[in-house]
């Protein structure tokens, strides 16, 4: 990486972690990546100041933050942590010429054309090839919440499509899913897709599948549920994980239909990346392809797991450099 005299600061801020790094004009990629816990800082401003102090960098020229929240008039209020970010306030504090907030999955969408074969794992039998001309992609991924976005290229222009589709209502497709929904409605006024496909979502499913025999329910966190499913020590954990992946597939399939993303759907998120083999042998593709009259179309859409360490930072770095280029 070149001089840090006027660096470009990028960040990928989720409900739990904030990852910061630097990029530079004319460079590719990023450097000086550090992960911070959101709970350790009163605000994003404080976390950024701590990051810059740790690496000994000067105030950034451009700041681009990918945030796990809807961005409205360059302001972000998180649903899964206490931070409130206003772009203008960041610009004033750090004397940055430009600050831009983008949705975290919009940032991941920007990374999709930049990923190498080594960054991807094919899920299903349909081979993926990066189109040479126009394309439409979708990306989805569970973490603290559930993110979704799209990326469209038409000619020499690329358009990201951020959204909050994961807060749409959950639509069960099997009798067992109907029963899970009915159980969860006793806990939540409204059951969104994110209530089932996220870190908390797998715990909700695990609780719901115990409602035929509540006395057997033992509270487990998401990591414990996945571990028990892998070693087969808990049949309810196996059931919960099966449902988790099938429902993820259903929602990913809905995303593909909504965007007409026939060129590919990408799966991101820290949860899934920890269990690639579990995903590969799960009912994900069954849920993805089960679209009635559109089943034959769905069978032709490739699905891939993103293995890159931080596609959010990769996409944010690309976006930030484009932003800096326009500024100059």
Regions found by a protein language model. Name each.
Residues 18, 70-72, 145-149, 204, ...:
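Short, acidic Gly/Pro/Ser/Thr-rich loop/turn segments
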Residues 8-12, 62-64, 100, 137-141, ...:
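Short glycine-aspartate micro-motif
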Residues 37, 80-81, 100-107, 128-130, ...:
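Active-site nucleophile and cofactor-binding loops and adjacent substrate-binding regions
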Residues 25-28, 80-84, 115-123, 153-160, ...:
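A glycine- and small-aliphatic-rich helix-loop capping segment at beta-alpha/alpha-beta transitions
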């Amino acid at each position: 990486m070149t001089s840090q005299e006027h660096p470009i600061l990028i960040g990928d801020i989720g409900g739990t972690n904030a990852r910061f790094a630097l990029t530079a004009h004319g460079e590719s990629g990023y450097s000086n990546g550090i992960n911070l816990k959101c709970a350790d800082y009163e605000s994003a401003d404080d976390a950024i100041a701590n990051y810059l102090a740790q690496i000994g960098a000067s105030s950034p020229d451009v700041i681009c933050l990918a945030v796990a929240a809807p961005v409205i008039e360059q302001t972000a209020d998180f649903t899964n942590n206490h931070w409130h970010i206003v772009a203008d306030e960041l610009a004033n504090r750090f004397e940055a010429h430009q600050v831009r907030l983008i949705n975290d999955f919009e940032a991941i969408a920007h990374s999709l054309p930049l990923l190498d074969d080594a960054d991807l794992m094919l899920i299903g039998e349909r081979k993926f090839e990066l189109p040479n001309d126009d394309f439409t992609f979708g990306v989805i991924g569970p973490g603290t919440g559930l993110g979704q976005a799209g990326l469209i290229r038409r000619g020499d222009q690329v358009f990201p499509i951020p959204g909050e589709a994961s807060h749409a209502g959950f639509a069960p497709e099997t009798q067992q899913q109907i029963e899970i929904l009915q159980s969860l409605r006793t806990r939540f006024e409204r059951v969104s897709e994110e209530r089932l496909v996220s870190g908390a979502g797998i715990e909700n499913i695990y609780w719901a599948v115990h409602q035929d025999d509540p006395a057997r329910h033992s509270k487990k966190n998401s990591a414990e549920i996945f571990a028990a499913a892998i070693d087969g020590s808990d049949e309810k954990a196996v059931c919960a994980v099966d449902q988790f992946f099938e429902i993820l597939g259903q929602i990913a399939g809905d995303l593909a239909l909504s965007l007409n993303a026939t060129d590919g759907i990408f799966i991101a998120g820290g949860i899934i990346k920890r269990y690639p083999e579990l995903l590969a042998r799960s009912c994900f593709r069954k849920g993805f392809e089960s679209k009635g009259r559109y089943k034959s179309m769905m069978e032709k859409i490739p699905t891939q797991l993103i293995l890159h360490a931080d596609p959010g930072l990769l996409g944010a770095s690309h976006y930030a450099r484009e932003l800096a280029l326009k500024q100059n």
